[in-house]
C-alpha cells in the first residue's frame, strides 16, 4: 500500500507539472496584463496607451503588449506586420496586396474594402505618427522597443479612424550609452532576414543618434505552369531608419527621425476553382507551389516609401507639451492576376 501511495503521489505531481507547463505555454508572447518574472520579482510593464508612461496595471483600457526578444522571435522569419494576426487576442490582419496595404480587424470590426484610399477603424501609430494610408501601414518592423495593441474606441486621445482600436509601435530611441546589435536568419526558399542597429552619444547628455537597417529577401518558389519556371513568390525588402535626439536642457527634447523603405517582389497569388460546391475543403486543383498565369506581367509589386518626423517635447513639471510634425510619402504599384 505504501508503494502504491508513493506512485500515485508521483503521478499526481507529474500531471500537475504538465498542466502547469501547458497553461504557461498558452499565454503566448502577448499578455494582458503581462507579468515578467526576474529573480522572484515581478517586473513592472510600462505602456503609453494614454499618451504618457504608465504601469499597465493602472491603465483602465484593454491593452496587450510585448517587447524585447519576443518581438525578435516573432519577426526573425522575415514576416511583416501581418505576423501579429493570431498572436494577439481579438486582432486579425490580412492583405490582398502581398507585402503591402494590410487590413486590420479588432474584435471583428474592420473594413474589407481593398481600395487603397479606404479608411479603416483600426489605426496604426508608429513612433507617435498616425500611418493613415494602408500603404504606409506595412513599413517593416525592426529595432523595436515594444508593440501595444489597444482594444476599443480610442477617438478621445488618438482622433479619427480608431473606432475598433489601435496598433501602436514604438521603436528604440537614441541614448547616451553606446549600444548596438546585428541579427541574421536563413530559412526555406532562400529566405533571409538581416537587421541591426548602432547608436550612442555624440555630445555628452546633449546629442545622441541611432541608425537601424533591415534587409529581407526570398527567392521565387512558385512555378508558373504555363512556362514551367519558378517565377513567383520572391521579394526584396530593404529599410533604414536614422534618429537624432537633442536635449539642450532638462525641459526640452527634440527628436528628428528619417526612415526609408524599398520593396520589390511578387504581389498576392490568387487561385481559382480550388473549392467544391458546398464544401470548405481545398480540392485537388489547389497546389501550394503551382499556378497557371498566362499574363505578360507575373504579379509584380514595387513600392518606395519615406517619412520624416520632428517630435518636440517641452516639460513643465506637472505637465508637458508635445509637437509632432511628420511628412510621409509612398509611391509604387501592385498587380494581381485574379
Annotated model-derived regions:
Residues 82, 103-105, 125, 149, ...:
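N-terminal periplasmic accessory domains that precede
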Residues 81, 114-115, 121-122, 127-153:
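Short acidic/polar hinge/loop motifs at secondary-structure boundaries
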Residues 229, 235-338:
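Outer-membrane beta-barrel domain signature, strongest for Gram-negative TonB-dependent receptors
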Residues 126-128, 171, 200-202, 244-247, ...:
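Residue-level signature of outer-membrane beta-barrel architecture
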Residues 179-181, 186-268, 306:
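Transmembrane beta-barrel wall of Gram-negative outer-membrane proteins
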Residues 63, 71, 84-85, 147-152, ...:
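Non-catalytic regulatory/gating segments with a bias toward low-complexity or hydrophobic composition
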Residues 48, 82-127:
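Extracytoplasmic beta-strand/coil segments of soluble accessory domains associated
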Residues 1-78, 82-88, 250, 308:
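N-terminal Sec signal peptide and the immediately downstream disordered periplasmic leader
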Amino acid at each position: 500500500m505504501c508503494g502504491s501511495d508513493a506512485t500515485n503521489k508521483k503521478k499526481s505531481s507529474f500531471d500537475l507539472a504538465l498542466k502547469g507547463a501547458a497553461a504557461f505555454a498558452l499565454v503566448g508572447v502577448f499578455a494582458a496584463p503581462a507579468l515578467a518574472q526576474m529573480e522572484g520579482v515581478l517586473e513592472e510593464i510600462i505602456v503609453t496607451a494614454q499618451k504618457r508612461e504608465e504601469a499597465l496595471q493602472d491603465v483602465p483600457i484593454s491593452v496587450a503588449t510585448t517587447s524585447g526578444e519576443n518581438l525578435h522571435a516573432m519577426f526573425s522569419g522575415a514576416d511583416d506586420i501581418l505576423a501579429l494576426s493570431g498572436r494577439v487576442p481579438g486582432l486579425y490582419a490580412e492583405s490582398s496586396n502581398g507585402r503591402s496595404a494590410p487590413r486590420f480587424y479588432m474584435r471583428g470590426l474592420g473594413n474589407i474594402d481593398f481600395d487603397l484610399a479606404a479608411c479603416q477603424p483600426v489605426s496604426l501609430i508608429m513612433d507617435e505618427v498616425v500611418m493613415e494610408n494602408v500603404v504606409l501601414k506595412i513599413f517593416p518592423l525592426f529595432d523595436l522597443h515594444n508593440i501595444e495593441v489597444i482594444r476599443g474606441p480610442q477617438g478621445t486621445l488618438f482622433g479619427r479612424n480608431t473606432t475598433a482600436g489601435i496598433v501602436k509601435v514604438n521603436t528604440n530611441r537614441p541614448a547616451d550609452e553606446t549600444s548596438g546589435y546585428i541579427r541574421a536568419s536563413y530559412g526555406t526558399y532562400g529566405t533571409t532576414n538581416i537587421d541591426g542597429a548602432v547608436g550612442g552619444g555624440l555630445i555628452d547628455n546633449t546629442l545622441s543618434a541611432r541608425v537601424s537597417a533591415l534587409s529581407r529577401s526570398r527567392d521565387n518558389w512558385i512555378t508558373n505552369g504555363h512556362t514551367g519556371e519558378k517565377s513567383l513568390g520572391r521579394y526584396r525588402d530593404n529599410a533604414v531608419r536614422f534618429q537624432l535626439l537633442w536635449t539642450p536642457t532638462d525641459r526640452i527634447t527634440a527628436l528628428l527621425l528619417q526612415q526609408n523603405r524599398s520593396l520589390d517582389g511578387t504581389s498576392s497569388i490568387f487561385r481559382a476553382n480550388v473549392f467544391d460546391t458546398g464544401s470548405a475543403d481545398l480540392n485537388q486543383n489547389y497546389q501550394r507551389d503551382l499556378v497557371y498565369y498566362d499574363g505578360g506581367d507575373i504579379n509584380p509589386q514595387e513600392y518606395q516609401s519615406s517619412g520624416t518626423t520632428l517630435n518636440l517635447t517641452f516639460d513643465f513639471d506637472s505637465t508637458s507639451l508635445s509637437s509632432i510634425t511628420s511628412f510621409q510619402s509612398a509611391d509604387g504599384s501592385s498587380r494581381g492576376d485574379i
